[in-house]
């Protein structure tokens, strides 16, 4: 099955999406038993066929396990440091340091639930977070993973959270009173907002090579090296 997924063109695959799967625990589970026996075999097969392991929605121990088990560096394609904003989807310093040591990539997210002050997060705060992340992980291993759901109706996020796995409503990162897609910060409403990030990073001292790396070149280099 993993080979078939690769043959269809997929080059990244998550082991879990918020909930427990046959492969690993999701970040919303109360108990995180790590990568399962089947998960270990799937990681091995992903390494063989050239699919990058993505642990963006997975729990702490499961993510650390995946970093340790995978022969190739893994990616956390869309998340931020938990130390900056305490969202269950964001990642601990321990994970970021392990990711650094293994050569993995993180894509920093602009999804409001992952941002300090949500929709009201400022570009200055976001760029300071980028600088703080660069103290934990090599700057060449930092990219953007916007998690931008542009133009999607709220029915999409409702299906994503519930799918067919339960009759009761699960609001995930939202709440009963805030169940819809959150409004994006005004500095990143679509891809044109990357220019605002470029300007913000320049203002706090990043040079042109570092900025271009964060905004795309680092992911490009990762693709060239690890996607076959």
Please tell me what each predicted stretch does:
Residues 25-26, 66, 155-157, 226:
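Short, solvent-exposed loop/turn and secondary-structure capping segments
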Residues 137-187:
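Short acidic/histidine-rich active-site segments
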Residues 81, 150, 221:
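Active-site micro-motifs of SAM-dependent methyltransferase domains
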Residues 33, 120, 184, 188:
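Charge-dense, low-complexity intrinsically disordered segments
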Residues 179-228:
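Mid-to-C-terminal alpha-helical segments outside catalytic/metal-binding sites
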Residues 1-119, 127-136, 141, 162-171, ...:
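Extended, charged catalytic domains and RNA/DNA-binding interfaces, predominantly
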């Amino acid at each position: 099955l993993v080979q078939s997924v690769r043959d269809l063109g997929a080059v990244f695959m998550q082991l879990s999406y918020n909930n427990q799967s046959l492969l690993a625990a999701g970040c919303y589970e109360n108990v995180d038993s790590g990568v399962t026996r089947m998960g270990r075999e799937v990681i091995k097969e992903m390494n063989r066929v050239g699919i990058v392991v993505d642990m963006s929605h997975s729990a702490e121990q499961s993510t650390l396990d995946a970093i340790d088990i995978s022969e190739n560096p893994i990616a956390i394609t869309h998340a931020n440091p938990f130390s900056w904003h305490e969202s269950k989807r964001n990642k601990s310093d321990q994970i970021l340091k392990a990711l650094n040591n293994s050569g993995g990539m993180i894509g920093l997210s602009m999804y409001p639930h992952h941002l300090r002050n949500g929709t009201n997060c400022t570009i200055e705060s976001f760029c300071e977070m980028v600088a703080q992340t660069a103290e934990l992980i090599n700057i060449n291993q930092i990219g953007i993973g916007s998690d931008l759901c542009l133009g999607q109706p709220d029915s999409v996020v409702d299906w994503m959270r519930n799918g067919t796995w339960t009759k009761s409503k699960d609001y995930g990162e939202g709440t009963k009173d805030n169940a819809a897609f959150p409004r994006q910060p005004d500095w990143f409403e679509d891809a044109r907002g990357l220019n605002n990030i470029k300007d913000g990073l320049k203002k706090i001292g990043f040079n042109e090579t570092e900025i271009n790396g964060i905004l795309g070149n680092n992911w490009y280099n990762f693709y060239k090296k690890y996607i076959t």
